[in-house]
Amino acid sequence: IGYADLPGASPTQIATITHLDVVPEGNGWDADPFTLRVRDGWLLGRGVADDKGPSVLCLYALKFLKDEAGPLRYPVRALLGCNEETNMKDVAWYNAHEKPPVFCFTPDAEFPLCNGEKGQFEADLISPVLNGDILDFEGGVARNAVPDRASALIRAELAALPAAEGITLEQ
């Protein structure tokens, strides 16, 4: 975790927090997802909305306060995390080594304002082999991202399987 500071008169600090890490890029990109580009007036690249754009916003806010606000009553810190997408151990490390701010705001969401995280659940589902017909099963590239596709390789008689949209049967 890194940070940028503006001094203030009080020892009581306020902060913003954003993150610079991203989930894996997934499928469907028509250009390198890690190269920022402009298309039709929009910035495109992995993590622009979550959360590099808000990170830049916080740094510009500090620059604005430095240039336009005059002396600040409270010091302001822009925290830039690098571990939000997995377990936020960087924040735990920060809190163990630095005094946490009395107020911390994150612009990591769309309007209207939200005041909480949806929570997370992570599990490994393990089953004994029931009949040996499932040879492989995959879905997604990261535990914390909704997969855009899934696949299963099964052993079965082709004639016994019904045709269905979105399912490819191969012999």
Predicted feature residues:
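Acidic/His- and Gly-rich active-site-bordering loop/insert found
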Residues: I1-R46, D67-L72
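Alpha-helical metal-binding/catalytic segments enriched in His/Glu/Asp
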Residues: T16, R37-E85, D124-V129, D148-E157
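Acidic, glycine-rich active-site loops and adjacent beta-strand->loop/helix elements
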Residues: L20-V22, V76-N87, P107-P112
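Active-site-proximal flexible loops/turns
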Residues: G26-G28, L57, M88, N115
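Residue-level signal for beta-strand positions within conserved beta-sheet cores that form or flank
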Residues: D32, L72-Y74, F121, E165
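Residues at alpha-helix caps and immediate loop-helix transition turns in enzyme cores, especially N-
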Residues: P54, D90-V91
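Midchain, well-structured core segments that form catalytic/ion-binding scaffolds
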Residues: E85, V91-Q171
